[in-house]
A protein has these predicted regions:
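Short, charged, surface-exposed hinge/linker loops at domain edges
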Residues: 2-6, 50-103
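A short, structured beta-strand-centered segment in the mid-to-C-terminal lobe
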Residues: 153-164
Length: 203
């Protein structure tokens, strides 16, 4: 039955200092719900999917909302990077390279998410001080894809956020759809830009 189709959810635990969890909708890279624990994150996925699809449609994307139930299929914990930052989890789905069309589509989603963040920072530029983790993560993802991120002395605050994303975008284009880690990098770039917008708006 259409109403009982299963959809995969991938859960990452310990995504921040508070120990919260993120539940990622497997069919929609970058669509993720945050919860105080895995169960609450997974429970929030259906509503998040509706919001995510609506957001994309509002920006001209033609996208059908997945119908059915969402189930946790895999769980992994965030770790720690060599630079002391939070090393984000990888899932089995991340090993599947996107098609050329998917790659182009998801790059577009990442650009839309970054535009949302830029708009939020225009209103509250001092919020950039709370997003050092985002710049560090983009720089780390770029490095994993083979493109060095900005040096520690290169920029700070808002400038560093944009410099790190420029490095990640360059890395993604260089890697192309067949690059190892591309799906994971896009998933995190979209999800965490949108999460950053919510963190800014909550203040």
């Amino acid at each position: 039955m259409a109403g009982t189709l299963p959809h995969a959810v991938f859960v990452e635990t310990g995504v921040d200092a508070a120990g919260r969890a993120m539940a990622f909708a497997g069919e929609l890279p970058g669509c993720a719900a945050v919860g105080d624990d895995p169960a609450s994150a997974v429970a929030a996925v259906p509503a998040r999917v509706t919001d995510f699809v609506g957001w994309l449609r509002a920006h001209g994307e033609s996208l059908a909302e997945p119908v059915g139930n969402w189930y946790e299929v895999e769980r992994a914990a965030a770790g720690e990077r060599a630079d002391g930052g939070r090393g984000r989890a990888s899932f089995s789905l991340d090993e599947l390279p996107p098609s050329a069309d998917e790659f182009a589509t998801w790059l577009g989603w990442a650009e839309l998410a970054r535009e949302e963040l830029a708009a939020a920072l225009d209103v509250q530029p001092t919020a950039a001080e709370r997003l050092a983790w985002l710049a560090a993560q983009d720089a780390a993802l770029a490095s994993e894809l083979g493109t060095p991120g900005p040096s520690d002395e290169a920029a700070a605050g808002l400038d560093r956020i944009y410099a790190a994303r420029d490095a990640l975008t360059t890395a993604l284009f260089r890697a192309g759809p067949g690059g190892a880690g591309v799906r994971r990098a896009l998933r995190l770039a979209i999800a965490d830009d949108l999460r950053a917008v919510e963190l800014i708006s909550a203040r």
